[in-house]
Amino acid sequence: MLTKLLPDQVAKFWDIIKFAVEESLPPIIGENPDKMNRILSSILSGKTQCWASYRRDGENTTFEGIALTKVIYDDASDTRNLLIYTVYAYNISAKESWVDGLLSVVKYAAAQKCSQIVSYTSEPYLVKKAKALGANTDFTFVPFNVADVCKTVANL
C-alpha cells in the first residue's frame, strides 16, 4: 500500500526516510551540506510529498519503499507536472505493490491538475517499464557541473 505521509509521520520515520532519500537522490542535487535538512523542510512544509509503501502484519509495519514527489510549474507553457523526485525500494516488491503505488501517484497528479508525471532514472529496467506504460523515453538528461564545464571550455 502506498500512502502519502503526513508531516508528523515524516518526522516519526525520518531516519528510515532519510536513508532511502540519500540512496536515491537525483543527479540535479549538488553537494550542499544542508541538503537533507532542506529536503525535510520541503516535505514538512508540503512543497514536496513523501510517499511510503508498506506492509502491516498486526502490530508490525514493514517499509517496502519511499518516494518523493513535487508538483512543478513551467510558467512558459503554463503546465503543471508531477515530478517523481526519488524512488527507493528496500527490497524487491511484488508487482501488485508497484501497480497500486503508481495508481496512487497518478490519482494524486490528476487531483493536482498535472498534465504529466515526469522523472529521471539511470535504471534501464525502469526506462523499459516506463516506455511500456506509454512514456516518451526519447530524451536524455544531460547535467553539466558549471565549474567543470568552465574549466573544460577554457582549455579548448
Spell out what each predicted region is.
Residues 21, 33-34, 76-89, 106-110, ...:
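Long, low-complexity, intrinsically disordered polar/charged segments
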Residues 79-134:
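Acyl-donor binding region in acyl/amide transferases
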Residues 45, 52-93:
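Conserved donor-binding loop and adjoining core beta-sheet/short helix segment
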Residues 28-50:
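Active-site rim helix/loop that mediates acceptor-substrate recognition in acyltransferases
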Residues 1-35:
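Short amphipathic alpha-helix that is part of the acyltransferase structural core
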Residues 10-15, 26, 42-45, 76-81, ...:
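A broad, low-specificity signal for short, low-complexity segments enriched in glycine/proline
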Residues 119-156:
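Active-site/acyl-donor-binding loops of N-acyltransferases
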